[in-house]
Amino acid sequence: MTPKHKIFILLPDGIGLRNFAFSNFYKIGKEKNFEIIYWNNTPFQLSELGFDELKIKKAKTHPLTDIFKNVRKKIELHLNVQKHNDTVYHSYRFPDSYKTIKGSIKNCAINTITAFYSTEKGLKKIRGYIKDNERTTQYYKESKKTLKQHRPAMVFCTNQRPALGIAPILAAQDLGIPTATFIFSWDNLPKATMILETDYYFVWSDSMKNELQFYYPYIDEKQIFVTGTPQFENHFNNSNLLSRAEFFNQYDLDLNLRYICYSGDDSTTCPDDAYYLEDLVLAVKQLNEKGFQLGIIFRRCPVDFSNRFDWVLEKYKNVIVPLDPKWDRIGKEWNTMLPTAADLILQTNTIAHTEMVVNLGSSMVFDYVAHNKPCAFINYDVKNKTQKNWSVKKIYNYVHFRSMPSPKAVLWLNSPDEIASEIESALRDSRLTVCDAADWFKVINQHPAKLASERIWKSIQAIIS
């Protein structure tokens, strides 16, 4: 047997837990004789799962890194508008907050620096400042010390977004250790969310590979590995599936009903979610009057702990059954919400035992098509909007929706009056919709989808060989 190669799996935050701790990723790596150590900056105790881990203690970025990170994003979006003559990149900007003195000073600094550096040369300097500053931190020094002690063959970061990933990656590069990062989500690259600069990049698909080179032309094709994402692998693991009777009994569901899943978004993406859920309830009631026996399972966005749905859940408690995601809340920010292995099982069984999903442009379309089930996208604005300047048109104008080969990949709910008829059509025969959705799934994620972890390990092996 070949000697074991030690691979550090860097978890700068909890975002990568689902893909790289709660999937088959670890098991497959061990079967390939890798020594896997999770370099863990999350509160989650991976040792309780039987994994080897090194806890990162007191990780802290340079005081200016967050400012420069935001400057970098603003410059990239500005240059994308100019280079590609496409104003969609303006829509990825978050409005500046001036609610506190500290926030006001920070945003003034960001905007001032951005104004002076909004060129390709300026962007390159900002990227350099980030690296130079991070190399002065205690976090960088401790990371380097850890790497010298353990000498891994490679450092693989689970997410390209967090600034807390910069120092460990730089420390590895400065020691000549190969580094890689995984692009976390299908919509990340057009948003200018990438802060890590590694030796190699692991992407979902050829489409994402093209995006990576489109937005970051300094990345060579040889640095990119198309692997797919472990995000959807759980749908192909039948050991997670409960019988319909078991699932319905466990969550007090009615065996006489067929359920439709309403999948919520975060409050920024869809501030009117609760009103769309109410429209779905009214449509389901119409269908039940025609002889259908339907209910609704509501799965909220895992990072949405708000009370904005309370009124609709109470008003229609005879129709809606909420099944909250089993995520752990460690802090108030969205990236301190940690996924759990139990939630993967809940999500898989929710999909397996519902007829279809309704949402606003979510990647749940791919989770459902993995089970050969359709998705309906909401495509209208409610009359009394929570935020007057918000519109569904903004959502579907985002770049990642341009990957859709055919608009027939989903059912489009263009008004409240259309919901009942579209759902009825899907319940009677959804084969064409599912077929087109499957084609879209193949565009955004390398197939077979169940072999993503296998391809990632093969790519790691190729890099270190």
Regions found by a protein language model. Give the residues of each.
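Conserved N-terminal ligand/cofactor-binding loop architecture of enzyme catalytic domains
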Residues: 32, 37-140
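Catalytic binding pocket for nucleotide-activated donors in carbohydrate/polymer assembly enzymes
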Residues: 196-198, 219, 363-444
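Nucleotide-activated donor-dependent transferases that construct or modify glycoconjugates
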Residues: 3-15, 41-42, 56-64, 76, ...
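Active-site-proximal region of nucleotide-activated glycan assembly enzymes
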Residues: 131-134, 158, 170-245
